């Protein structure tokens, strides 16, 4: 997977330089998923939190080396837990143009292949919403999630309605 990511990004960087294109992004936040006492997916020889951190740091280095006018920020650069609301605060505080969250899947397959990419956009909005709800369940693992998120419970059925309303309002305003 990592090899594929490097090839894909290298091709994109070369194309961007050849075309002399102007980057649409001035500030990018790279979020290494999980961390600290939240390992994410656990394999026989690795933990998601370690893989996401390594990939995030390499991606940031590639962007910095090839796109000199783009500022790269990270939600974490060491193995520590950063609560979900703080990750979004980092991006909002600097007015980031792009937020990239790196995650890995687990598989019982002995020779897994492939990758998944999710991008919030106007197509497949329902699928994007389901992914967001799944990722937001990590909120329940935080020590003070009731205080940090004003009592928000990602499992409460009424939140499906609220998520849909917010998503529709965001899409209409985009």
Predicted regions and their residues:
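Bacterial N-terminal signal peptides
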Residues: 2-11
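Sec/Tat signal peptide C-region and signal peptidase I cleavage site
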Residues: 12-16
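Catalytic-core regions of hydrolytic enzymes
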Residues: 17-152, 167, 171-172
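Polar helix-capping/helix-linker motif
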Residues: 155-156
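Short glycine/proline- and acidic residue-enriched helix-loop micro-motifs
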Residues: 159-168
């Amino acid at each position: 997977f990592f090899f594929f990511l490097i090839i894909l990004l290298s091709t994109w960087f070369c194309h961007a330089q050849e075309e002399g294109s102007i980057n649409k992004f001035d500030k990018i936040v790279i979020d290494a998923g999980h961390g600290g006492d939240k390992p994410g997916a656990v394999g026989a020889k690795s933990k998601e939190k370690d893989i996401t951190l390594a990939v995030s740091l390499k991606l940031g280095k590639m962007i910095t080396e090839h796109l000199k006018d783009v500022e790269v920020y990270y939600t974490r650069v060491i193995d520590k837990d950063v609560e979900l609301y703080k990750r979004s605060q980092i991006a909002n505080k600097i007015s980031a143009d792009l937020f990239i969250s790196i995650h890995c899947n687990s598989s019982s397959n002995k020779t897994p292949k492939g990758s998944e990419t999710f991008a919030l956009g106007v197509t497949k909005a329902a699928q994007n919403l389901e992914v967001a709800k799944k990722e937001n369940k990590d909120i329940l693992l935080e020590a003070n999630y009731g205080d940090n998120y004003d009592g928000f419970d990602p499992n409460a059925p009424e939140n499906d309605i609220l998520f849909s309303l917010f998503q529709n309002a965001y899409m209409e305003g985009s």
